[in-house]
Amino acid sequence: MSNGQLVSQVTVGHDKPLDREKVCPMLLRVFVANNRHNPMSEYNSRNGGSVPPSELQMHTWMDCSLRELTSLIKEVNPDARRKGTTFDFAIVQADRGSPRYILRDVGNTTNGERGIDDNKTLQQCKFEVGDFVDVAISLPSQGRRFNNREQGDRFDHRQRQRSPIR
């Protein structure tokens, strides 16, 4: 990343198209949290396999893109529909060497913007049946406001019109 370009952590290959009419969908367990990923301590393979409380269950296919998952999350989460909201996706998978889970970042999408991760599929992210998807939803930051107005009050507006510096 020395030349200032954005580089994705997951390489996008070209997979064969999946016929959704013939292939049975799988159950995808998605866990969302605001401004952060769920703590790994909430994913516990002991004690009956506890998981975070904010679970969404979706039936989808391995060729489902991160943009499609974003749309499905927005259907059930009205706050996430705002332009500029960022969805940071990670896969939570069992660590094969121990009885715990590990979190692996796979990409992010933003409402109202196109991104390099939009068309990544679960298959390209190396998702396996039995894994979870953890999504950190970050609402756009609120700009400086005056009396609930983006541009300030009437006085501020008049001052900007008269100012020689624009």
From Swiss-Prot:
Disulfide bonds: none annotated. Residues 143-166 are annotated as: Disordered. Interacts with SIN3 and histone deacetylase. Acts in transcription repression. Involved in the tethering of the SIN3 complex to core histone proteins. It comes from the Eukaryota. Residues 147-158 have a biased composition (Basic and acidic residues). One of its GO terms (biological process) is negative regulation of DNA-templated transcription. One of its GO terms (molecular function) is transcription corepressor activity. GO terms for cellular component: nucleus. This is Probable histone deacetylase complex subunit SAP18. InterPro entries: SAP18 (IPR010516), SAP18_sf (IPR042534). Keywords: Repressor, Transcription, Transcription regulation. The lineage of its organism: Eukaryota, Metazoa, Ecdysozoa, Nematoda, Chromadorea. Belongs to the SAP18 family. The keyword Lyase does not apply. It comes from Caenorhabditis elegans. The keyword Isomerase does not apply.
